Regions:
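Hydrophobic alpha-helical segments of integral membrane proteins
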Residues: 12-21, 84, 144, 210, ...
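A secondary-structure boundary/capping signal
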Residues: 33, 71-72, 89, 126-127, ...
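Short gly/ser/thr-rich secondary-structure transition/capping motifs
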Residues: 24-31
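Catalytic core of membrane glycerolipid acyltransferases/transacylases, capturing the structured
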Residues: 2, 7-15, 23, 37-102
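Residue-level signal for beta-strand positions within conserved beta-sheet cores that form or flank
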Residues: 27, 65, 86, 159, ...
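Alpha-helical bilayer-embedded segments of polytopic membrane proteins, i.e.
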Residues: 306-315
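Structural motif corresponding to alpha-helix initiation and N-cap regions
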Residues: 31, 78, 107-110
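Non-catalytic C-terminal accessory region of glycerolipid acyltransferases
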Residues: 3, 97, 102-305
């Protein structure tokens, strides 16, 4: 049985399982940018990954059609589970941690992925290769680009191959029935990208350029905080500086957070020495706030420390 074969059982399960889980888990799901999903070629979804269970379901719900997902290979080890996950339209992908011999099996997996794309089924991957509850991005693995480039090599002359940058944002990672926003960005036309750069750069450089472009576009779709040692302090500052904003829609909240993050990064990068003191204050405040079980939205600038932080960042 091919993973992309039509199956009435899967269709029923998707409607009876995905929709109720989303409705129970989320208060509201906002979908933006569906007009960016190409209709004239092969579509690969490349999304950030912050929740192991909900992220695939959010994409599946927002796509509203059968979508093939790549997932870690270790859950496919038992034959029975392999059949179950194939029925659920999932394919394994091997990672370095699985061992070199296992990674070599990805050549066959890439062939299957290309076959999926040839049959016009969307393929969804989380190129960070693991999940974590952070408003940031880890380095993107090469698998998504190997698949896209191989698909383009095999049938790019017939129809274009696209990678669609996707961002998933949750209002609160650890709160039951929070809001979620999934945003589909402008697609990367891999076929056109290869045509523009072929012969000018090596295959390795071409892949690296695609990697940089996807990472940049993904970061623009979420409340992105650079993944550095200052992440925790910067995100705490962001929450404090936006705590007193009026009620906003989930999408408006992302825009507000992005603006605050940009100001914080600009301000702290311009004065690294002062930034270290500010980060220390922010982390100390976070520790005290959590001990007292106070959410950032409950804070106000009347508190001298918060006032000091707010004035320093000049928001």
């Amino acid at each position: 049985m091919q993973v992309y074969n039509k199956n009435i059982g899967y269709t029923l399960l998707r409607s009876l399982w995905v929709n109720p889980i989303i409705s129970l888990s989320l208060r509201r799901l906002v979908v933006r940018g569906k007009e960016n999903l190409p209709k004239d070629g092969a579509v690969i979804i490349g999304s950030n990954h912050t929740n192991a269970l909900l992220d695939p379901l959010v994409i599946l719900r927002s796509m509203n059609r059968a979508t093939i997902f790549m997932t870690r290979a270790d859950i496919f080890r038992r034959p029975l589970l392999q059949k179950v996950f194939t029925f659920l339209k999932m394919l394994p992908i091997y990672r370095i941690r699985d061992g070199y011999a296992a990674v070599k099996q990805n050549e066959e997996i890439i062939r299957k992925c290309v076959d999926v794309l040839r049959h016009r089924y969307p393929l969804a991957l989380f190129p960070e290769a693991t999940h974590r509850p952070k408003h940031s991005l880890m380095g993107l693995s090469k698998g998504i680009f190997h698949i896209a480039l191989e698909a383009n090599k095999q049938f790019g002359h017939e129809k274009p191959v696209y990678i669609v940058p996707t961002g998933i944002e949750y209002g609160r990672y650890f709160r039951y029935r929070s809001n979620a926003v999934v945003t589909y960005g402008k697609p990367i036309n891999v076929t056109e990208f290869v045509r523009q750069h072929e012969g000018e750069v090596t295959p390795a450089r071409l892949l690296a350029m695609l990697r940089e472009e996807l990472a940049r576009r993904m970061s623009e779709l979420i409340a992105f905080v650079p993944d550095t040692e200052a992440y925790d302090a910067r995100w705490e500052l962001t929450k404090l500086c936006t705590a007193q904003s009026p009620p906003l829609s989930p999408a408006e909240r992302i825009t507000l957070n992005r603006a605050a993050i940009a100001r914080i990064v600009e301000k702290t990068d311009s004065d690294p020495e002062a930034a270290q003191a500010l980060y220390a204050d922010a982390l100390a405040f976070k520790k005290e706030r959590r001990l007292r079980r106070i959410h950032p939205s409950s804070t106000g600038h009347k508190h001298p420390l918060i006032a000091s932080i707010g004035n320093t960042v000049a928001l």
